[in-house]
Amino acid sequence: MKIVCIKGGLGNQLFEYCRYHGLLRQHNNHGVYLHYDRRRTKQHGGVWLDKAFLITLPTEPWRVKLMVMALKMLRKLHLFKRLYREDDPRAVLIDDYSQHKQFIANAAEILNFRPFAQLDYVDEITSEPFAVSVHVRRGDYLLPVNKANFGVCSVHYYLSAAVTVRERHPDARFFVFSDDIEWAKMNLNLPNCVFVEHAQPQPDHADLYLMSLCKGHIIANSTFSFWGAYLSMGSSAIAIYPKQWFAEPTWNAPDIFPRHWIAL
């Protein structure tokens, strides 16, 4: 029996769903379940997987919910560690963030966006010879605890990344996506640039979809940002990510990046 916990925002949820899907294949579609951690998805608006993608999520059986409660109690008491340790192949409860490229190798096969009835910028992005997404994440990353652990990417990082892109693709046009677009407009002086602002309110995954339409990507230290590039329909002709993924020096960057991506 394997139980994969769904938690965090959409970026993390995608890693976790891919882990679940891989385990299903490994175990011949038997004995693998999802647990929806409402407490740890609530602050991100809940579970977004089936709203953003053509996914049918399974119902969580009551016995799985009870099993998770029991396993979490054992974890608090430090008992039967093999049942929940992240590095133990015998673990039943998989409650890490599953961020490794081995778990997402088949992501393109299982993750297809739900169509949007109407969405600004689609034609503008797809008509460009070389559209580049630039994702600036601030928002919750500015909270003291998150800033200490994650940090925010510097203006220098974005400007340097833009120079790197233009050296290879002089015709690049940059499309800036951000949860703080006013800050981006005031601080990012990028050439040939469009700041993405929707005429009507759109869910966050609208930006994820638009980012995936681009041929190049400059991402933030964010799993949401990562997926915008990884699911790129332009096959990511160039993708740049921050070498320092975390502000906390003892945390290592996750092994999720394709070899041809550039660390800066």
Q: Where would I find each of the regions flagged by the language model?
A:
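Short amphipathic alpha-helix
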Residues: 15-23
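Extreme N-terminal starter segment of soluble prokaryotic enzymes
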Residues: 1-3
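Donor-binding and catalytic core of enzymes assembling or modifying cell-surface/extracellular glycoconjugates
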Residues: 10, 163-250, 256
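A short beta-strand-loop structural module common to alpha/beta enzyme folds
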Residues: 29-41
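Active-site regions of enzymes building and remodeling cell-envelope glycoconjugates
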Residues: 48-57, 189-198, 252-264
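A short, glycine/small-residue-rich beta-strand->loop->alpha-helix junction that serves as a flexible
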Residues: 5-15
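A short, Lys/Arg-enriched amphipathic alpha-helix followed by its capping loop at the start of a domain
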Residues: 22-28, 168
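Secretory-pathway luminal glycosyltransferase catalytic domains
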Residues: 40-164, 168-169
